[in-house]
Amino acid sequence: MKLAVIGSGTMGSGIVQTFASCGHDVCLKSRTQGAIDKCLALLDKNLTKLVTKGKWMKATKAEILSHVSSTTNYEDLKDMDLIIEASVEDMNIKKDVFKLLDELCKEDTILATNTSSLSITEIASSTKRPDKVIGMHFFNPVPMMKLVEVISGQLTSKVTFDTVFELSKSINKVPVDVSESPGFVVNRILIPMINEAVGIYADGVASKEEIDEAMKLGANHPMGPLALGDLIGLDVVLAIMNVLYTEFGDTKYTAHPLLAKMVRANQLGRKTKIGFYDYNK
């Protein structure tokens, strides 16, 4: 199967690493060569860490990297069997990408999106192949997290679903069958919890460290909600909260003002080195 990933950010890089590590040839598509170089450097760094820790041999790293190619040109994707879009969480941008891919790619190409909350059906509406559009939602950090939410839109075919579901197993992931709903399963539960933690912190109920420690020890979570928000990206948390509120119209999904203020200040978490915690230290 010929595979491509669109997007060279944290998720795109992780998806590429995961497929290549399992022996799949995968093409990384990004807008600029600079973005590709940055992504490949990150991939090399991550693989080097695994070699240093003794988990892989140097030859294994070289073999994995040999499975990765790259391009800045959409034309190079026209013969792909499956394309996974992992670009910014913006409906208009995703629809533009899918419209272009639909016009460019062969008829049987499956178009998957790594969206964390947006409607698969609406994304598919920008194409003439809604039966071949599907959600394939990975979790960060992709190489470590076992789950993939496989989300069918209203018109996604069983053949498309089965193909992606089985492919997910082939890369050592555990796929779950999810019907389309805002936030799907994990983020519909998780993101409002993070938003609630933001509110508790803003109200002065406890410090950020105490909130995170309380959830780790009291709820057996491996990471506290504020630290997790920093890992996910507070801009992503805000975007998902806004989707949930827009789709359901329920005030329980209202993003906390502090969350919005931090995003406006570009305090997004690990990706900007500052969020609820300072990562410059």
From Swiss-Prot:
Keywords: Fatty acid metabolism, Lipid metabolism, NADP, Oxidoreductase. Pathway: Lipid metabolism; butanoate metabolism. Its EC number is 1.1.1.157. It is an enzyme of class 1 (oxidoreductase). It catalyses: (3S)-3-hydroxybutanoyl-CoA + NADP(+) = acetoacetyl-CoA + NADPH + H(+). Belongs to the 3-hydroxyacyl-CoA dehydrogenase family. This is 3-hydroxybutyryl-CoA dehydrogenase. It comes from Clostridioides difficile (Peptoclostridium difficile). The lineage of its organism: Bacteria, Bacillati, Bacillota, Clostridia, Peptostreptococcales.
